[in-house]
Amino acid sequence: MPKPINVRVTTMDAELEFAIQPNTTGKQLFDQVVKTVGLREVWFFGLQYVDSKGYSTWLKLNKKVTQQDVKKENPLQFKFRAKFFPEDVSEELIQEITQRLFFLQVKEAILNDEIYCPPETAVLLASYAVQAKYGDYNKEIHKPGYLANDRLLPQRVLEQHKLTKEQWEERIQNWHEEHRGMLREDSMMEYLKIAQDLEMYGVNYFEIKNKKGTELWLGVDALGLNIYEHDDKLTPKIGFPWSEIRNISFNDKKFVIKPIDKKAPDFVFYAPRLRINKRILALCMGNHELYMRRRKPDTIEVQQMKAQAREEKHQKQLERAQLENEKKKREIAEKEKERIEREKEELMERLRQIEEQTVKAQKELEEQTRKALELEQERQRAKEEAERLDRERRAAEEAKSAIAKQAADQMKNQEQLAAELAEFTAKIALLEEAKKKKEEEATEWQHKAFAAQEDLEKTKEELKTVMSAPPPPPPPPVIPPTENEHDEQDENSAEASAELSSEGVMNHRSEEERVTETQKNERVKKQLQALSSELAQARDETKKTQNDVLHAENVKAGRDKYKTLRQIRQGNTKQRIDEFEAM
C-alpha cells in the first residue's frame, strides 16, 4: 500500500488538510477542495504552489500532483485562489462563498498594494469591509477605537498622510454609518463593484519586448490583451479584445498572436523565459473561454445556480426583515415602557404637588377661620361698647331732664344748676361723638367679618375641587407602524498553439460601453471628490509614488478604466499592431 502524502491547502479564510495518494491528479485534489468549501463556480479558481525554483505556478489538473515540480515540504503547500476574474462581479459571481473568496483576495491585493487604489477610494472600500465584518454601526457597541486592530488601508496611504489612527477611523466610520441596513454579503459585493473599476484589478502582468527590443508590460485580463509602457502599469496604451484574436502560439520565447482580421499582420512579442510564455498561453485560453461563455446564454447549471442564489437571497432578506420588525417592536415596547415609567413619575410628582397644595390650603383655611373669629369678637366688643355708651347717653339725658326739672323747681340755685347743666350738655356731646365713632367701628368690623366669611367659603370650595379632581389622563399610546483545464504545457515542450473560436457570440465588445460604479452614483462621486480634497491637505507630497502621479494625471485628464479601454481599441487591428511595433 503506497504511503499517503499530506497536503495543506490554504483558502482566503481557512486551512484545509488532506491525505492524497501518489497517483492523485491535480483535478482530484481540486475537486476535493471545492467540495469541502461548498463551491460550484469552479471555473474562476485554481491551486497555486511554489515550485523548486521559487516561482509561483498553477497546478495542472490533468497531471498527477507528484509529477509536478511542487516544492518538497511536509505537508505539500497549496493556495486556493482566483485564477480568472469576472468582467462584472454583480452579474457573474453567483454564490455567496464565491463572492466572499473574491472579496478577501481582492482586499488583500489592495492592502498589499498589488492593486493600486487611490486614498479616498481606499477609505470607501474600508467602510464596506467594516460593514461586512461588523454589520450596522451602533454607537453603543462600536465605541471610539473599535477599528484599532483592523488592517483596513494600504500602508502607502497611511504613510503619505499626516493623520492619526483616530482621524482615519473617524473618516471610515462616517461612511460605515451610511451603510446601515446593508447585508454583509451585499457589502462585499459593493466592495468588489468599486474595486473592479481600479485599473490594476484582475490584470496579470508579464514583462515582454517588441521586435525593436523595447521593454513593455503585457496585461492579460478578462477583456483581452493590453500593452503598457514599462513605467506605467495603470494606463494601457494599446488594447486587443479577445473577440479580435483567432490563434495564439509560442515557439521558445517568441509569442505570436494571429488576429481575426486577415489583412492585419501577426502580433509578435518576446518573453524573457519559456515558462512565462506557457503561463501567458494558459491565461489567454482561460480568459478567452470565459469571455466567450459570458456572451452566450447561461448553461442550465448556471441558470439553476442563479435561481438558487436568488431564492437564498430572498430568504435572507425575509429573515432580515423579520429581525428588523422584531427589533422595531422591541424598541417600541421599550419606548412604551419608558413612557409609562415617565408618566408614572409625572403622576407621582403631581400627586405630591396636590398633597402640598392641600396641606397649604388647610393651613390657610385655619388661619382665615382664626382671623374671622377674631373679627367676630372685635365686632361683638364694639357692639357691647356702643350699647354701653347708649345706656350712658340715656342716663345722662335722664339726669339732664331731672336737673332741668330741678332747675325749674329751684330757681334760687340757678347759677349752680346752670353750671351743672352746661357740664352735662358737654358730656352728652362727647358721648354722642364717641357713640357715633363706635358705631362706625362696629360697621367696619362687620364688613371685615363678611369679607373673611367669603374668603373662608371660597377656600373651602377650592379645597373641595382639588380633592375631588381626577389625575390628568395619560397621552394616547404610540401605535407602531405596522478550468476546463488550460495546461501550461509540458516543461519540455518549447512550442504550443491554441485556436480561439468566436462562433455563436453576440455583442462581442459590450464592455466598451461600461462606466465606473462611481459615475453611476453622483452622491458617492461627490463624497469621494470631497474626501480627496480633504486628504490632499494632509498629504506629504514627498512620499508620492509613481502610481500616485500617474493616477493624478488620469484624473486631471478625465480618464478612467473604461474610457481608456475605448481609446486604446480605436482604429483597426493593423493600426494597433503597427503602433505596438513602433513603441
Swiss-Prot record:
**Where does the record place the modification Phosphothreonine?**
T564
Spell out the activity regulation: A head-to-tail association, of the N-terminal and C-terminal halves results in a closed conformation (inactive form) which is incapable of actin or membrane-binding.
**Residues engaged in binding a 1,2-diacyl-sn-glycero-3-phospho-(1D-myo-inositol):** K60, L61, N62, K63, K278
Taken from the UniProt entry, a GO cellular component term is: cell tip
The cross-references to InterPro entries, in alphabetical order and at most eight, read: Band_41_domain (IPR019749), ERM (IPR011174), ERM_C_dom (IPR011259), ERM_FERM_C (IPR041789), ERM_helical (IPR046810), Ez/rad/moesin-like (IPR000798), FERM/acyl-CoA-bd_prot_sf (IPR014352), FERM_2 (IPR035963)
The subunit field of the Swiss-Prot or TrEMBL record says: Interacts with CPNE1 (via VWFA domain) and CPNE4 (via VWFA domain). Binds NHERF1. Interacts with LAYN. Interacts with NHERF1 and NHERF2. Interacts with MME/NEP. Interacts with ICAM2. Interacts (via FERM domain) with SPN/CD43 cytoplasmic tail. Interacts with CD44. Interacts with CLIC5; may work together in a complex which also includes EZR and MYO6 to stabilize linkages between the plasma membrane and subjacent actin cytoskeleton at the base of stereocilia.
Q: What is this protein called?
A: Radixin
- Taxonomy-wise, where does this protein's organism fall, top ranks first? Eukaryota, Metazoa, Chordata, Craniata, Vertebrata
Gene, per the UniProt record = Rdx
